[in-house]
Curated annotation (Swiss-Prot):
Mg(2+) binds at residues 126, 156, 158. InterPro entries: THDP-binding, Transketo_C/PFOR_II, Transketolase-like, Transketolase-like_Pyr-bd, Transketolase_BS, Transketolase_C, Transketolase_N. The record marks 46, 232 as: Important for catalytic activity. Keywords: Calcium, Cytoplasm, Developmental protein, Magnesium, Metal-binding, Thiamine pyrophosphate, Transferase. GO terms for molecular function: metal ion binding; thiamine pyrophosphate binding; transketolase activity. One of its GO terms (biological process) is thiamine metabolic process. It is an enzyme of class 2 (transferase). Its main location: cytoplasm. This is Transketolase-like protein 1. It comes from the Eukaryota.
């Protein structure tokens, strides 16, 4: 706390009077009563965790924060993120360790995009400080000088299984926060006046985020339960709860309420609906360009169309080509460094309340580390767009650690998530534009090697609509691919046609939702024969998605070609053949299917 602002005297005009302090204390007591009653009625919940933070909540919501109670989605309202295992508005966090990253995204948006006065408060448990994602967020907030962000550590000593590593050694938490570059205050979390003071002082600090390390006690105000182990996530027995509620009620001295301060209304108006590219794709059939590069170009083009498009990257921007966007719009590019978990949570925060159209990009393989954050974003139905490059064995020389072979399966499990797998540059640009306007999470899967443009600039694309690239009345088998395997399917079709064997070739474009109508009609036109081919593991991939889509039709047979085993390093075309997804293997599969 070397900064003068951090040591600022608490001015008389900002101090709550004795009556206000009593009201804040009484409100904390009422919050305890509400938590006891709510958890008893459902036989589930965390009354002891609620009790430890009641004074913090009372001071924040009824003295410090500025918001309109009648308009909780107001863009000028202060934001509150509850990272403890409790429900809250704006963005769900669920498992611990995600809330601070979301708060960072909100604070970054407020400071750099909205340039508004609203502040962001994040309440965390001491237990979740064992999560690495917390410290990814701490580093991010410090690096970007998020002085509109306050993180409150509710240090109540106890976790689910007993005492936490640091217990009540408050100085350990203080030193850790200060080491990460945060302005840090230590406070008695039961003292409403002290809480009012440190939150006011935090509002005076510039160029640094503030951490408030509050010493609290789990189950505060409940005799024989306060600071006792084995009460985590346990509602109180009803007969005991009634006595405790009466005890707490006896300590309440006033029925007065406090109204929150109104927000400062200085957020800009934002329109992120019906975002359109300003011109068609500028590619010609036969051009060669990697879809990862086409994606970077499309992001820059979208950024020109709407100034609320923002791009985040995890220190891979020269490989994902998000650097193209960064060069054009550096003020709307967020470098998150090698912290994929935090990158996803920051994107969730940026997109909250409809303030931005957020795209987060990195290697698709690296997104597996962030899956828990992705999953919670899906549960919240957040409108974020995630781009995963370097997919499948077609990555080539970089080897197995860089090859995403699980990503489709991962994103298929996310409710209402749209999965784009564009084949060429034209379809990639359309995928980016469609994702910007889609509801819910979107995942765009891009490829490392250059591929040929096969669609004209005038081609139209829609979510859930596949493209039939080859078809005739003599087709015997439907071959379904996406991305890199579409080219293998087309090559197989050319070779087979020389032998008077004709196959129908489908480019899925979106893996979720599938174009079931086109798949089924094509299968029926080819005597019920389908072959899927994908640069992905068989589990959870395109083959399984297609099988599920046609499972009720006993006359349709599906044969899947997919990568099996741990891949090696090599040339892209060598690996496609080695792992059974090249044109040669498609030809063999077609002939075997016809023999059967």
């Amino acid at each position: 706390m070397a900064d003068a602002e951090a040591r600022a005297e608490f001015p008389e005009e900002a101090r709550p009077d004795r009556g206000t302090l009593q009201v804040l204390q009484d409100m904390a007591s009422r919050l305890r009563i509400h938590s006891i009653r709510a958890t008893c009625s459902t036989s589930s919940g965390h009354p002891t965790s609620c009790s430890s933070s009641s004074e913090i909540m009372s001071v924040l919501f009824f003295y410090i924060m500025r918001y309109k109670q009648s308009d909780p989605e107001n863009p000028d309202n202060d934001r509150f993120v509850l990272a403890k295992r409790l429900s809250f508005v704006d963005v769900a966090t669920g498992w611990l360790g995600q809330g601070l990253g979301v708060a960072c995204g909100m604070a970054y948006t407020g400071k750099y995009f909205d340039r508004a006065s609203y502040r962001v408060f994040c309440l965390m448990s001491d237990g979740e400080s064992s999560e690495g994602s917390v410290w990814e967020a701490m580093a991010f907030a410090s690096y970007y000088s998020l002085d509109n962000l306050v993180a409150i550590f509710d240090v109540n000593r106890l976790g689910h299984s007993g005492a936490l590593p640091a217990e009540h050694c408050i100085n350990i938490y203080q030193r850790r926060c200060e080491a990460f570059g945060w302005n840090t205050y230590v406070v008695d979390g039961r003292d409403v006046e002290a809480l009012c003071q440190v939150f006011w002082q935090a509002s005076q600090v510039k160029h640094k985020p503030t951490a408030v390390v509050a010493k609290t006690f789990k189950g505060r105000g409940t005799p024989s339960i306060e600071d006792a182990e084995s009460w985590h996530a346990k509602p109180m027995p009803r007969e005991r709860a009634d006595a405790i509620i009466k005890l707490i009620e006896s300590q309440i001295q006033t029925s007065r309420n406090l109204d929150p301060q109104p927000p400062i209304e200085d957020s800009p108006e934002v329109n992120i609906t019906d975002v359109r590219m300003t011109s068609p794709p500028d590619y010609r059939v036969g051009d060669k360009i990697a879809t990862r590069k086409a994606c970077g170009l499309a992001l820059a083009k979208l950024g020109y169309a709407n100034n609320r498009v923002v791009v985040l990257d995890g220190d891979t921007r020269y490989s994902t080509f998000s650097e193209i966007f960064n060069k054009e719009y550096p003020e709307r590019f967020i470098e998150c460094f090698m912290a994929e978990q935090n990158m996803v949570s920051v994107a969730l925060g940026c997109a909250s309340r409809g303030r931005t159209i957020a795209f987060a990009s990195t290697f698709a393989a690296f997104l597996t580390r962030a899956f828990d954050h992705i999953r919670i974003g899906g549960l919240a139905e957040s409108n974020i767009n995630i781009i995963g490059s370097h997919c499948g064995v077609s990555v080539g020389d970089d080897g197995a650690s860089q090859m995403a072979l699980e990503d489709i399966a991962m994103f298929r499990t996310i409710p209402k998530c749209t999965i784009f797998y564009p084949t060429d540059a034209v379809s990639t640009e359309h995928a980016v534009a469609l994702a910007a306007n889609a509801k819910g999470m979107c995942f765009i899967r891009t490829t490392r090697p250059e591929t040929m443009v096969i669609y004209t600039p005038q081609e139209r694309f829609e979510i859930g609509q596949a493209k039939v690239l080859r078809h005739c009345v003599s087709d015997k088998v439907t071959v379904i691919g996406a991305g890199i395997t579409v080219y293998e399917a087309l090559a197989a079709a050319d070779e087979l046609s020389k032998q008077d064997i004709f196959i129908r070739v489908i480019d899925l474009f979106t893996i979720k939702p599938l174009d079931v109508a086109t798949i089924v009609s094509s299968a029926k036109a080819t005597e019920g024969r389908i072959i899927t081919v994908e640069d992905h593991y068989p589990q959870g991939g395109i083959g399984e998605a297609v099988c599920a889509a046609v499972s009720m039709d006993p006359d349709i047979q599906v044969h899947s070609l997919a990568v099996s085993g741990v891949p090696q390093s090599g040339k892209s075309e060598e690996l496609l053949d080695m792992y059974g997804i090249s044109a040669r293997h498609i030809i063999v599969a077609v002939k075997c299917m016809l023999l059967n």
